[in-house]
Design a protein with these regions (language model features):
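Generic structural signal for helix capping and beta-alpha/helix-loop junctions
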Residues: 41-42, 92, 116, 147, ...
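Short glycine-rich anion-binding loops that position phosphate/pyrophosphate groups of nucleotides
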Residues: 44, 112-114, 246-248
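Charged helix-capping and loop-helix junction motifs
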Residues: 121-125, 197-201, 254-261
């Protein structure tokens, strides 16, 4: 059984992301752990969720948990099991151990993309989170309206396209029969590759190893690189952007994501792999 971990800092963005995570969990038949930072003393110890001798994870009765329990009554068939625990913060050893011990499939975090400090805040937060987890991080923007995924776009240089990453994306996309597009954008400092060579790499190194029919490749014109996020959202119709936390692409893309306070396009969720 897959498990989705939702990070709860008690903000409206966290609640927004958690409700989406619940719908996602129902779709893929996963359970949910809500990891909350809490000051309340109204907690119950749950021995099955112990981190170790230094202390136990704790179950809470937060407003978010009450909301999720109410929301899941909508489902006619599968209803995710929801647990809530306490972490000291989202950057320490507790998070690392939790994602490993519970074999977490996905970590979900909300964000307010319109804050003036959004770029600095999200980059710092993502950097710290990705250094402590071994599974993908799904970042859900506050302005995004829930809908089924139809186009999942993985921005990468084909020469660094990870099979495990594509396999994960294809598995997720299959729940909606969505398209997976590998958008090739040459990494800074590397020579451009011809479209035919890119197609050969895609066919031999990617497509032939992934059992998913709705998988394709598109080239990103070099002239469009400064606005590649706008391109893939508008022209490729991406409703989920996929990145790998690699310096030659990730920083460039996240800077574009927050360009002009996201006024250039409708912000969509980001699925970020830690390696």
């Amino acid at each position: 059984m897959k498990t989705i971990l939702v990070l709860n800092d008690h903000s409206t963005t966290a609640s927004h992301a958690a409700i989406f995570a619940l719908d996602l969990a129902q779709k893929i038949r996963a359970n949910i752990i809500v990891a909350s930072i809490m000051l309340s003393d109204d907690v119950i110890r749950h021995e099955d969720l112990k981190l170790g001798e230094t202390g136990s994870l704790l179950i809470h009765r937060s407003e978010l948990l009450k909301t999720l329990f109410a929301q899941k009554k909508r489902y006619a068939d599968f209803r995710p099991v929801i647990q809530e625990i306490e972490l000291t913060d989202f950057t320490g050893d507790e998070l690392h151990q939790l994602t490993n011990d519970r074999n977490i499939y996905l970590v979900v975090r909300g964000m307010d993309e319109f804050l003036p400090s959004a770029l600095i805040s999200i980059n710092l937060s993502i950097s710290m989170l990705l250094s402590n987890i071994k599974c993908p991080l799904l970042v859900v923007p506050s302005s995004w309206n829930f809908k089924a995924f139809r186009e999942l776009v993985y921005l990468t240089d084909l020469r660094f396209c990870g099979i495990n990453t594509v396999s994960y994306i294809a598995d997720l996309a299959g729940e909606w029969n969505a398209r997976v597009i590998i958008a090739h954008s040459t990494a800074s400092g590397l020579p451009e590759i011809e479209e035919k060579d890119a197609e050969d790499i895609f066919k031999n190194e990617v497509h032939n190893h992934i059992n998913y029919k709705n998988l394709s490749m598109r080239m990103v014109d070099k002239a469009m690189v400064p606005d590649v996020i706008k391109l893939v959202v508008h022209s490729f119709h991406a409703d989920l952007l996929v990145f790998v936390n690699q310096h030659f692409h990730f920083n460039t893309f996240t800077k574009q994501y927050f360009k002009d306070k996201c006024a250039l396009y409708e912000p969509v969720p980001m699925l970020i792999f830690p390696y």
